[in-house]
Curated annotation (Swiss-Prot):
Domain of life: Bacteria
Protein name: Oxaloacetate decarboxylase 1
Record key words, sorted: Decarboxylase, Lyase, Magnesium, Metal-binding
GO biological process entries: oxaloacetate metabolic process; propionate catabolic process, 2-methylcitrate cycle; pyruvate biosynthetic process
Record's subunit section: Homotetramer; dimer of dimers.
Length: 289
C-alpha cells in the first residue's frame, strides 16, 4: 500500500481548505484511532488539547500538558496517520517565542495544520479562566508562527472565542489575524447562523468552527456557503473509549454483568478528579470562573 508523506497530507488538507465543502473532523488521540478514522473515510482528524491531557496525564483540560508531552503524542499519531491531522496547540505554550518552538516541534511531528488560540493560558492569578490576550499579542503569535514554519504547506490557523466578546470585537480580532497571514480562522462559541454570517462576511480565509454538535449549526451546505471548511463536533470517540474500557474491566472483575449506567462524561469526571484542580486554582491563584 502506498503511504502518504507528511507533505502529501498537508497538501491534501490545503485542498480541503480550497474546496467548497464543509468537512467534519474525527477525534484522533493515538495511532489506532488515527488508523480507524482514515479507514472509515474521514478526510481530516483533530488531536484536541483536552483529549491529549486526558490521554497523557489523566488530567482535566487545565493547560497542564507540556509542549513536549503534546508533541510526543502528535509524533506517535504522525508515524501512522494517513489522513491530515490538525493539532490543537492551545496558546502555543507561552509567548510568541514559545509559539515558535511549538511550530518547530509540531511540524516535525507531522501535523497538517495547527491552531493557536488567543485565550489567556494558563489561568492567571485573580483572572477569569476565559480571558483573552490583547489583539496585538495575538497578532504577534501568528506572525511568529509563520516565521518559524519551514514547510509552507502546514496551515497555521488562528483561533478565538466568539462567545465572550461582542461580534464587532471578534470581527476586528479575526480581521487582524487574517491580515497577519493566518491560513484560516477557527472560532469557538458561535451560537447560530446569524452570528456566523455577521462575522464571516468580513473574512476571506477559510473558517473552522468548534461546534460541539450545536444543532443550530447542523447545515453543512449553509456552513460551506459561509466559508466554513472544517467543523470540530467534539471528541465523542474518546469518551466512548473510556466508557467501553470501564465496562469491560468491570465485567472482567465480575462485579456486575451489565454495562454501567454511568455516562462517559461522568466517568471522565470521576477519574480526572477536577475538583482538586479547581480547589487548588481558587486557593493558590484566586482564579475566578
Amino acid at each position: 500500500m502506498t503511504r502518504l508523506s507528511h507533505q502529501d497530507l498537508r497538501r491534501n488538507f490545503r485542498q480541503l481548505l480550497a474546496s467548497d465543502t464543509c468537512y467534519h473532523t474525527a477525534s484522533v488521540f493515538d495511532p489506532m484511532s488515527a488508523r480507524i478514522a482514515a479507514d472509515l473515510g474521514f478526510e481530516v482528524g483533530i488531536l484536541g488539547g483536552s483529549v491529549a491531557s486526558l490521554q497523557v496525564l489523566g488530567a482535566p483540560d487545565f493547560a497542564l500538558i507540556t509542549l513536549s508531552e503534546f508533541a510526543e503524542q502528535a509524533t506517535r499519531i504522525g508515524r501512522v496517520a494517513q489522513l491530515p491531522v490538525i493539532a490543537d496547540a492551545d496558546h502555543g505554550y507561552g509567548n510568541a517565542l514559545n509559539v515558535m518552538r511549538t511550530i518547530v516541534e509540531l511540524e516535525r511531528a507531522g501535523v497538517a495544520a495547527l491552531t493557536i488560540e488567543d485565550t489567556l493560558l494558563p489561568a492567571q492569578f485573580g483572572r477569569k479562566s476565559t480571558d483573552l490576550i490583547t489583539v496585538a499579542e495575538g497578532v504577534g503569535k501568528i506572525r511568529a508562527a509563520l516565521e518559524a514554519r519551514v514547510d509552507s504547506e502546514m496551515a497555521i490557523i488562528a483561533r478565538t472565542n466568539a462567545g465572550i466578546l461582542p461580534n464587532q470585537e471578534i470581527i476586528s480580532r479575526t480581521k487582524q489575524y487574517q491580515a497577519a497571514g493566518a491560513d484560516g480562522i477557527c472560532m469557538v462559541g458561535i451560537q447560530d447562523f446569524d452570528q456566523l454570517e455577521q462575522i464571516a462576511e468580513h473574512l476571506t480565509v477559510p473558517l473552522m468552527l468548534v461546534t460541539y454538535g450545536n444543532p443550530a449549526l447542523r447545515d453543512d451546505k449553509r456552513l460551506a456557503e459561509l466559508g466554513v471548511r472544517v467543523t470540530i463536533d467534539g471528541h465523542g470517540a474518546y469518551f466512548a473509549a473510556i466508557k467501553a474500557t470501564y465496562d469491560s474491566l468491570r465485567e472482567q472483575r465480575q462485579i456486575f454483568t451489565q454495562a454501567s449506567d454511568l455516562s462517559a462524561t461522568e466517568l471522565t469526571h470521576t477519574y480526572t478528579q477536577p475538583e482538586e484542580y479547581i480547589l487548588w486554582a481558587k486557593e493558590y491563584m484566586s482564579v475566578k470562573e
